[in-house]
Amino acid sequence: ELILLSAAGILFIIQLIYYFGLYNRIHARNKAVRKEEVHFSRELPPLSVILCARNEAENLRKILPAILEQDYPQFEVIVINDASTDETEDILGMMEEKYPHLYHSFTPDSARYISHKKLALTLGIKASKHDWLVFTETNCMPASKDWLRLMARNFTSQTQVVLGYSGYDRTKGWLHKRV
């Protein structure tokens, strides 16, 4: 019985070492990819970045410069104002003067019997000039100025969808405790 318990303990320790080693390799690789400079030799397709905003004035003030100043040859940013009651419209107008590749529109207040988010996305898609569309949220900050390049490097003629993710930053507050 003692031999079986010892063998199980040894196997458990070996398994833990394996999992920690595997996790550390994945973590180190992801860290290296984030730090490396991105250089691409092939031509990058023009992109349309689409955001929907409903009362997101503070987030737009932070995220739009990070998106609009991406190191990418040709792209446009389309923000659909979804019936905001805060300063969203003012911020979009001010930033549109500074950034010529920023465009914005709005969803009508009278829209009923349809999801406002779906309507806003549809309007953004219809307003886009380019075939490749990138969707993001107003609370997802790009990790670097190469964010669009990193997304576009996976585009091929056979590609239909490229997915990315945004890590979750834990902050204080009751809402974040629930997540």
For the regions a protein language model found, what residue spans apply to each?
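Short aromatic/hydrophobic "clamp" motif used to bind/position activated sugar donors
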Residues: L121, L133
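The conserved acidic donor/metal-binding loop of glycosyltransferases
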Residues: E137-M141
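Short alpha-helix within the catalytic core of nucleotide-sugar-dependent glycosyltransferases
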Residues: L64-P65, E89-D90, H130, S144-T156
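N-terminal membrane-anchoring/stem segments of glycan-assembly enzymes
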Residues: E1-F40
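Conserved donor NDP-sugar-binding/catalytic core segment of glycosyltransferases
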Residues: K145-L175
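Acidic donor-binding segment of Leloir-type glycosyltransferases
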Residues: L64-S110
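Cell-envelope/extracellular polymer assembly enzymes that use nucleotide-activated donors
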Residues: P45-S48, E76
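Short, well-formed alpha-helical segments that are part of the catalytic scaffolds
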Residues: A28-R34, E56-E69
